Amino acid sequence: MEKGTDRMAAAAPAPPAAASQCRSPRCTAERRGVRRELDSWRHRLMHCVGFESILEGLYGPRLRRDLSLFEDCEPEELTDWSMDEKCSFCNLHKETVSDRASVIGSSQSTPTEELSSQGQSNTDKIECQAENYLNALFRKKDLPQNCDPNIPLVAQELMKKMIRQFAIEYISKSSKIQENRNGSSFEPSLICKSIQMNQTENSLQEEQDSPLDLTVNRTQEQNTQQGDGVLDLSTKKSARLEEPKYDPLCSENSVSGRLHRHREDYVERSAEFADGLLSKALKDIQSGALDINKAGILYGIPQKTLLLHLEALPAGKPAPFKNKTRDFNDSYSFKDSKETCAVLQKVALWARAQAERTEKSKLSLLETSELKFPTASSYLHQLTLQRMVTQFKEKSENLQYETTNPTVQLKIPQLRISSVSKPQSDTAGLLDVMYHVSKTSSVLEGSALQKLKNILPKQNKIECSGPVTHSSVDSYFLHGDLSPLCLNAKNGTVDGTSENTEDSLDRKDNKQPRKKRGRYRQYDHEIMEEAIAMVMSGKMSVSKAQGIYGVPHSTLEYKVKERSGTLKTPPKKKLRLPDTGLFNMTDSGTGSCKTSSKPV
């Protein structure tokens, strides 16, 4: 039995002494990460729990009592410390005073005794002004001049001396700059004014929560008036407008010379600005829509350039970069209204003559069974006249509002045309009424124009109950319910297909601008042309032109690619059939109407 058990124990696998580590790279990386975390927590634990708490846990609460013994070891007053004669920082104050005295002595031609006394008095003045400056500075910020009691007294004294020394250096250097600029001796009034200016500058910087700036600003200008001595603290952007205040002697020469230089610089840099941007910015400034600052920021043009252009315009100088087509349109639209009325009266007389000629040709139309296109052309002439009236009205409205909003067209419900026509005025009368209405009411003008355009709306086939007589045809023509294109005198019927034929011909020959449906179509075509020209010339990118001109990005990009010939799929050209193939004149003998041939 013992031998059997020994064999079984030998056959059984021995338990592993220690788990072998996996050598895959993933497990190795995880082990390194865990080890790194443990190492980092050793350092984090001191900051999270506190070093004193860790020591207290290790050594007990007795250690903390022992550490508290060293809290009151700092002496309150310094008795054994004195200024070192060889310290460069401590002697800096004396060197500055001596340098100041030598500078004042060299600037004046007085004896040495007077120089020393005057230098000493000036030094005292500078120190007094520095004290006042620091007091005003601390009082403005509501900060105590005494330092934190936790800071050692040696460090407190050093900080106070350093701040005081910086203030003295700052005031002395600012007075040097004023002496060099004015060419005169050291004046206390100028020092006081410079101190006031420095206080205002530092208070502005402190209000912005920025550190105290003690650097010397060498390009600082004296903003005081010479007449009454009132300090001007206004911060204006344009130095050209401020120059006559503080330099009255040479102001005229300097301003004229600077303007001349600006004009020369403008002529040299004129090619950098866009064709339409400058004209548009000037137009917005003159209309009051934008300020000069806002226009300069929006269009990217310097304010000096805009000011020069605004000054050049009333002087009679032609402003460059004006769009020629826009100038032509503006001059054309600003003509006298009497001239426009005379042109419209001539057009109305011409339309009345065309209407009389159309009425005379009605009887000949009934006698001959063929369709004559002069009547259709007169009908299109009438529509053209109404379009001219609306264009004149739109131009006058655009001058007042200067907007590119699409004109609102009223939709008139389509009525079925019965065989009995409604009593209406003749075409010439309607034309004169439309001319007078276009002056008074825009709503009536829109409705009447829509009625004239849609004289025959789309409808089902209508057949007359009896043969068409001369009187019925005259009534159709006079009341404007049917167009001459819709009559077939052979069988005496009015068909819907002929009506569709007339409608398609009207749409092809006299296309009206379709209603703008979405945001992507609400843009001015002139502005779009300017944007396309700027992008194609390389002066702007598509995104910048979109932001400045306010045109759709996709439309602008498509039009630029279309004109440059870089479209991947160029648009297909529409096939136009000749005029002879527009209508197939067929007569089946059963009263069928004309059929329009559809383009392939």
From Swiss-Prot:
<comment type="function">
    <text>May act as transcription activator that binds DNA elements with the sequence 5'-CCCTATCGATCGATCTCTACCT-3'.</text>
</comment>
<feature type="compositionally biased region" description="Polar residues">
    <location>
        <begin position="583"/>
        <end position="600"/>
    </location>
</feature>
<keyword id="KW-0010">Activator</keyword>
<feature type="compositionally biased region" description="Polar residues">
    <location>
        <begin position="104"/>
        <end position="122"/>
    </location>
</feature>
<protein>
    <recommendedName>
        <fullName>Ligand-dependent nuclear receptor corepressor-like protein</fullName>
    </recommendedName>
</protein>
<feature type="DNA-binding region" description="H-T-H motif">
    <location>
        <begin position="542"/>
        <end position="562"/>
    </location>
</feature>
<dbReference type="Pfam" id="PF05225">
    <property type="entry name" value="HTH_psq"/>
</dbReference>
<keyword id="KW-0539">Nucleus</keyword>
<keyword id="KW-0805">Transcription regulation</keyword>
<dbReference type="GO" id="GO:0005634">
    <property type="term" value="C:nucleus"/>
</dbReference>
<dbReference type="GO" id="GO:0003677">
    <property type="term" value="F:DNA binding"/>
</dbReference>
<feature type="region of interest" description="Disordered">
    <location>
        <begin position="1"/>
        <end position="24"/>
    </location>
</feature>
<keyword id="KW-0804">Transcription</keyword>
<dbReference type="GO" id="GO:0006357">
    <property type="term" value="P:regulation of transcription by RNA polymerase II"/>
</dbReference>
<dbReference type="InterPro" id="IPR009057">
    <property type="entry name" value="Homeodomain-like_sf"/>
</dbReference>
<keyword id="KW-0238">DNA-binding</keyword>
<dbReference type="InterPro" id="IPR007889">
    <property type="entry name" value="HTH_Psq"/>
</dbReference>
<feature type="region of interest" description="Disordered">
    <location>
        <begin position="581"/>
        <end position="600"/>
    </location>
</feature>
<feature type="domain" description="HTH psq-type">
    <location>
        <begin position="514"/>
        <end position="566"/>
    </location>
</feature>
<feature type="region of interest" description="Disordered">
    <location>
        <begin position="495"/>
        <end position="519"/>
    </location>
</feature>
<feature type="region of interest" description="Disordered">
    <location>
        <begin position="102"/>
        <end position="122"/>
    </location>
</feature>
